[in-house]
Amino acid sequence: ARLASDLDDYVVSLFRQAIAAGADQTEMYYWTQIEKNSAVAPRLVNELATYYKRKRNYDKAYLFYREFLQYHSEDVPALVSCAEMEMMRGKEKDALKTYEKVLMLDADNLQANIFLGNYYYLQAEKDKKKLEEDYKKITSPTRMQYARYRNGLSDVFTNSYGKAKTYLQRVLQVFPSMEAGNTLEKIKKMELELK
């Protein structure tokens, strides 16, 4: 077993060198020559994912992180990297789902909590702004229209701001982030205004 492990380490080292010498050929070698159910295959695909992430080729990095996750679907660092690639590819909704999966596995994951906290905060800001703009268009609002506006604001606070607050509070438990603290202060101030 020790010999096999040393041999796998050596194979991974050679594979890493091959990637540096020619990533396209090494990638082709992976797809056509590597036995996908071999013990070393996940390590090789992880090398390709890491290489493409470093080179900022987010599409290929994403592809290889997804491939790696076929082997280790609950690997938190790989899920976080996959979510980063989804963001870089403009797939916010996919990143959202991936970060939510990360938090199911590791509730204190800093990156996932920061992303989700900021995502829901920005979503809440956008929804609040739209409600305010729509309400301002009404020249003389009736009580019913005002009540609808207040209910809409209340929903935004309960849902999006509430979620943002939960995630950002977790961030502060793990890491003293000034930005998360400032955002929480803004949410608190708005909550007081709404009451």
Residue spans of the language-model regions?
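Canonical positions in the second alpha-helix
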Residues: 1, 33-34, 67-68, 101-102, ...
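TPR alpha-solenoid repeat register
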Residues: 10, 44, 78, 112, ...
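Short coil/linker segments at helix-helix boundaries
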Residues: 122-167
